[in-house]
Amino acid sequence: MERTFAIIKPDAVERNIIGKILEKVETAGFRIVGMKKILLSKCEAEGFYYVHKERPFFNDLCSFMSRSPVVVMVLERENAINTWREVMGATNPANAEAGTIRKDFGLSIEENSVHGSDSPESAAYEIPYFFSQLELL
C-alpha cells in the first residue's frame, strides 16, 4: 500500500464542499488514514511550500493557503500518488477532465480546491509536516 498527502484548500472549505470531495476520495478506493481541519499560519504555509519560494506566485499562494481553514489528509491505497493526481485532475480546472475534483469544483489555477503530493519524495516530506505517526491509523 502506498500513502499520499492531500489538502482540501480554503476555496473548497469556504464553499462547504468538503463532503463532496471526500465522496470522490472514498469512491476512488482510498482509505483515509489521517485527517484534520487546521488554520495554517502564513509562516507554516511558507514552510510547506518552500520548494516554490523563488517562484513569482509564492507569496500569493502562501496568503491564499493561510486565509481560512484547510483539511489535511493522508490517503492510502495501491498506487495512491498517481491515482490521487488522476482524481484531482489538471492543475488548471479549465484543462481538467470531466468528473475530476478540479473540473467539478475548481475556480481557477490557484483556487483549484485540492493539493496532492506529486512524488514519493514529496509525500515523504508533506505527510510528517502535518501528522505524527501516532495520528495515522
Curated annotation (Swiss-Prot):
Oligomeric and partner information: Homotetramer.
Active-site residue list: H115
UniProt protein name: Nucleoside diphosphate kinase
Reaction(s) catalysed (UniProt annotation): a 2'-deoxyribonucleoside 5'-diphosphate + ATP = a 2'-deoxyribonucleoside 5'-triphosphate + ADP; a ribonucleoside 5'-diphosphate + ATP = a ribonucleoside 5'-triphosphate + ADP
Keywords linked to the UniProt accession: ATP-binding, Cytoplasm, Kinase, Magnesium, Metal-binding, Nucleotide metabolism, Nucleotide-binding, Phosphoprotein, Transferase
Protein family: Belongs to the NDK family.
CDD domains: NDPk_I
Amino-acid positions noted as binding ATP in the UniProt annotation, renumbered to this chain: K9, F57, R85, T91, R102, N112
UniProt organism field: Geobacter sulfurreducens (strain ATCC 51573 / DSM 12127 / PCA)
Gene this chain is encoded by: ndk
One biological process term in Gene Ontology: pyrimidine nucleotide metabolic process
Database matches in PROSITE patterns: NDPK, NDPK_LIKE
NCBIfam families: PRK00668.1 (NF001908)
Compartments, record wording: Cytoplasm
PANTHER family: NUCLEOSIDE DIPHOSPHATE KINASE, NUCLEOSIDE DIPHOSPHATE KINASE DDB_G0292928-RELATED
Cytoplasm found in the keyword field: yes
GO MF terms held by the record: ATP binding; metal ion binding; nucleoside diphosphate kinase activity
S-S pairs: none
HAMAP family membership: NDP_kinase
